[in-house]
Amino acid sequence: MDFFSQKKQSTPLPARIYQEGENGAVGQRTREMRLVKDRLLELSDQLRAPLAMNRRQFLQSSCGLAAAFLAMNSVFGPLFAVNPAEAADPEESAARNRFLKEQLIFDVQTHFVYPDYPATNILGLRRLAKRWNPDLQGRQTPEDIHFDNFYREVFLESETDLAVLSSAPNDDPEQWFLHNEDLARAREKVKEKSGKKQLYSHAVFTPGRPGWMDDLEKAIALRPDAWKGYTVGQPIGESQWPWRLDDEKLVYPAYEKMMKAGITTVCIHKGLLPSNYKKRMAGTWKYGRVDDVGQAARDWPQLNFLIYHSGIRTGGVPGREEIRIFEESGEIAWVSDLARIPEKFGVDNVYAELGSVFAVSAVSAPRYCSGILGTLIKGMGEDKILWGTDSVWYGSPQWQIEALRRLKMPEDLQRKFGFQSLGSASGNLKNRIFAENAQQVYPFPSI
């Protein structure tokens, strides 16, 4: 299949962080989102006139992006570092952009699907994201999640320097996002376009499926940069083939092959279940927990286990009850379990990846998002957190990059739970998360 034909696309910078969803419904954070939207429109009308911009031009500018964070601060409290001058003066905004231009960004989770991919439900994520990303307004089409748009949104419309292309299996082979051969081809195609290694690729392994060990051998020949596995069998809906990381009989022989092949980074989708997971995945949801990570990591210290989505239990906007529990106890379902693994099992080869868990919480419940980061950093160490965006499901990752650069740790959470400050946009901690930690598991290219 040829998924590399190019189209000319427009490239506006995401600016408007919130937008009402279909029929005005935006889930459990509706009131806050509407307040942010109203404040942003008010700010834009105040600030755009001296700049001789219409509303759309302003919201798609760097000043508009700064105004969006000011609007969020007005609703959620001072959770994002933003100078009001950035929203009023293009030179102030440009100066900040120049200062951060050299910051390295390594996104360890990106996606697209092959052209004939039959399911359209994945477009629902882009429909969700259009609440905060204006580039996604209007009808979403299958082409939006194909290679052309992937390359444009990740490498041209954002400051992402390096990325990892991943995939997901399905019991129906036609519904894999990409097969392993496609992943390898995409890596080489991007290298041809850029003249250097800019895209890394996974190979998916599927314990328990007929012929899966033979497929693993074939994948080794493709020389993937890392492995990707789904212990629930497939991300949505029940699979015939769930499995556990610590299954000595089924999975440990595969680890042996991985180790001998010298491909020792094992990425595992955990959590991110649908809200009705106990019904929709009644027989398999328990395999999405992180209770099998510690033993496998202890038994295989030669391997690095990267837990994608940080194991967060569900993938939706954080609900009031989840936020209440966190504020009272510091617990975040399954994320806290993951954060306890290094101390509980005495391991240092477990990492937390931020794809989707950051995207969904940063702009809908930023204080809770800070709590997720604080929990992971405290339990796992600041050298074990990896930047991932799950793009192109949410459009260009630039808005996520800006959100992490600006996100702050509330002082009361630092006192109550012992969380550390997140530091400045280009401070040591955020530089580690954005790229330096990834170098431990994905060697940087020499050119």
PLM regions and their residue ranges:
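C-terminal segment of N-terminal export signals and the immediately downstream linker at the start
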Residues: 45-53, 73-110
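Active-site beta-loop-alpha junctions enriched in small/polar residues
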Residues: 111, 168, 204-208, 232, ...
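Catalytic pocket-lining loop regions of alpha/beta-barrel enzymes
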Residues: 241-387, 413-415, 421
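N-terminal secretory signal peptides
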Residues: 1-53
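Active-site gating/metal-coordination segments in enzymes
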Residues: 170-288
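Acidic (Asp/Glu)-rich catalytic clusters
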Residues: 152-159, 180-196, 216-224, 256-260, ...
